[in-house]
Design a protein with these regions (language model features):
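Extracellular loop and loop/strand-boundary signature of outer-membrane beta-barrel proteins
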Residues: 60-66, 115-122, 141-143, 190-197, ...
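Residues on the lipid-exposed face of transmembrane beta-strands in outer-membrane beta-barrel proteins
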Residues: 46-50, 77-81, 131-137, 156-160, ...
Length: 339
């Protein structure tokens, strides 16, 4: 029970932020509808930017390298309705790629030797549909053409995210990427005390801030940073324990579940010999230079069934940074009534 509460604490905090923002917005809407001074308007935007993943392969304890070490891209499109001078709502679609690699982030003197030994990697193309409320710190004037030159804002909402993590198979089997969820790399769906396969759709709570610059009467340029708290610990296909390899469905599932004995890092290549020798020395006191480290790792208790493969106490999350080009649709012209 404590693990469940700890794991969902961030989502609850983010949910509270959403509720507060929506409450502020609802009060503003009520106040503004009592006045006819502001003319609501709409806008459409396209954007591109960066994406960073946080999880088993990119821990919060190393914020800089986790944010920038495996930074990838995102593209987005959105529609927004501005109801009052301060409050608006936005519907958006974002395609974001996230990625992680134990070898890259833990090779050499940096990082965690135990993560280097794990030798997992992944990439995941996220398809996010989000509904967010926007609160402008500097209010608009009564019409869109009189909006301020600079307008900082905060936002929060809810999102549905479709995902499907993949990884490159060992180099001896050829250069191709495979979907990880059907393999059940932690025993998902196998007989015995194993969980069912994880869902490829998850909920997320987007929260963030940005600043909008009025380029001219119809166009804005904005910069935005938003963090996504998700309800999934499987964006990277890593969460709990190593399974009994005998329950996995085939050799491919076994090779993708435990990659500690691979001589080469599969995602981009790279000799793992020195790093694995260092891990065996630090963790198990194995110092014999004549021992093959890729054989020796299999003779230790590392990655035995039931030992930790991930961190089940915390879900995976991601951060998006965006530049948006926005076109103001304006408001319909109100014709005087015919008499």
């Amino acid at each position: 029970m404590n693990t469940f509460l700890e794991k969902n604490r961030n989502v609850k905090i983010a949910g509270l932020a959403v509720a507060v923002l929506m409450l502020i917005g609802s009060e503003r809407v009520t106040a503004q509808f009592k006045s006819s001074s502001f003319v609501p308007y709409s806008s459409v935007s396209v954007g591109l930017g960066t994406s960073s993943y946080y999880g088993e392969m990119a821990p919060y304890s190393r914020p800089l390298i986790s944010t920038f070490g495996m930074m990838r891209w995102n593209v987005s499109a959105s529609y927004a309705r501005h109801f009052t001078p301060r409050f608006g709502a936005r519907a958006s679609f974002t395609w974001a790629r996230i990625s992680g690699d134990d070898y890259k982030l833990n090779n050499g003197d940096r990082g965690f030797p135990i993560n280097f030994a794990r030798n997992l990697h992944f990439r995941n193309d996220l398809k996010e549909f989000a509904l967010t409320g926007i609160f402008k710190l500097i209010p608009d004037s009564r019409s869109y053409d009189r909006r301020p030159q600079w307008s900082p804002y905060i936002f929060a909402g809810i999102a549905a995210v479709a995902h499907n993590p993949v990884a490159r198979i060992p180099d001896l089997d050829g250069d191709r990427w495979v979907k990880l969820q059907p393999l059940g790399t932690e025993g998902q769906g196998s007989p015995g005390d194993y969980p069912k396969a994880y869902s490829l759709v998850t909920l997320a709570i987007p929260v963030g801030f940005g600043v909008r610059y009025k380029f001219n009467q119809r166009f804005d340029l904005s910069a935005e940073v938003g963090f996504r708290f998700t309800t999934s610990d499987y964006l990277d296909d890593v969460s709990k324990n190593y399974p009994d390899p005998n329950v996995l469905k085939d050799d491919l599932a076994r090779s993708m579940s435990n990659r500690s004995a691979e001589p080469t890092a599969a995602r981009k290549g790279g000799d793992r010999t020195t790093g694995l020798r260092n891990f065996l020395t630090q963790q198990y006191g194995i110092t014999d230079a004549g021992i093959d480290p890729f054989v020796a790792i299999g003779q230790t208790e590392y990655a035995t069934p039931g030992t930790l493969r991930g961190n089940p106490a915390r879900n995976d999350n991601y951060l998006l940074g965006n530049i948006h080009l926005t076109y103001i649709l304006g408001s319909p012209i109100k014709c005087p009534p015919l008499k």
